[in-house]
Amino acid sequence: MPDIEGRIAALPIWSGPVTLAPLPGGISNLSFAATDQRGKFVVRVTRDFPFHHVFRDRELMSARAAHAAGFAPAVVHAEPGLMVSRFIDGRTLTVADVQASIPRIAEFLARFHRDMPAQLSGPGFIFWVFHVNRDYLRQLRDSGQPAAQLDRWLATNAELEAAQVPLPITVGHHDLLAGNLIDDGRRLWLIDYEYAGLGTAMFDLANLSSNNNFTPAQSRELLAAYFGHDPDEQLLRSHAAMEAASLLREALWSFVSVNHLDRPGVDYAAYGRENIVKLDAALAAWHERFGQ
């Protein structure tokens, strides 16, 4: 990437000299910590990823809405290819932290889903994981991947979609990795809005639990805390199906990324295979518990 640090340093928003340091983590985007006389910021180097349904105008719209609703840091500057936000001085959560904070995070998500729609402006963007999976499978088919395996995953995707229960449309985050939650000692913050958009709460709930290795008991605890009552069998079945759909999406995301992304040190194919192993285990458990 030609002299990206020089471009960042030349932005007119800085007060005095600016110091840049690459931020670790992330398997698709590059970010820097930037410090000037006013404080610390995060600079996100961006471009559209149409193959992943990621468009940066939508990310910016969602990030600004999340700040207005009280969930995300302020965006202080945005231009094609760059987005600058306030740095949150806090501790990035781990998987163990998420598992130990289920009621707190459930309450946070319930507020997020309640308060975000009123702050969102501009054209709506739908995130429906089953459509995303179908499109990923179409892309993989077009790139020459073996049809038999793709057909099996397509049938699995349809089976999991049929298990969903009706829920209201809201605004979801759709990328609930532990690393996107920050605790500043007083409250939680949620960052990284490239997949945010309209959808149902179920994907956020299942994405959180599947990304953070919840047990069935922990998933039940999450649903009870979020909905305010013990989940019935239909809700549990729907959530477990969505967990599997989330794992399928993560695997297909990886396989599609092989053809488009090249972050140093990231083996997208291996990451995809890891998620297929998790998917197969989740499907076996789902069928054993809830039947075909």
Indicate residue ranges for each PLM-predicted region.
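ATP-binding pocket architecture of kinase catalytic cores
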Residues: 22-127, 132-148, 166
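Active-site acidic catalytic loop and adjacent metal/ATP-binding pocket
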Residues: 22-43, 158-203
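ATP/Mg2+ or Mg2+-diphosphate-binding catalytic cores
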Residues: 139-148, 252-292
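Active-site activation/catalytic loop segments of kinase-like enzymes and analogous catalytic loops
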Residues: 202-231, 244-263, 278
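Start-of-helix signal in alpha-solenoid helical-repeat scaffolds, especially tetratricopeptide repeats
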Residues: 237, 241-244
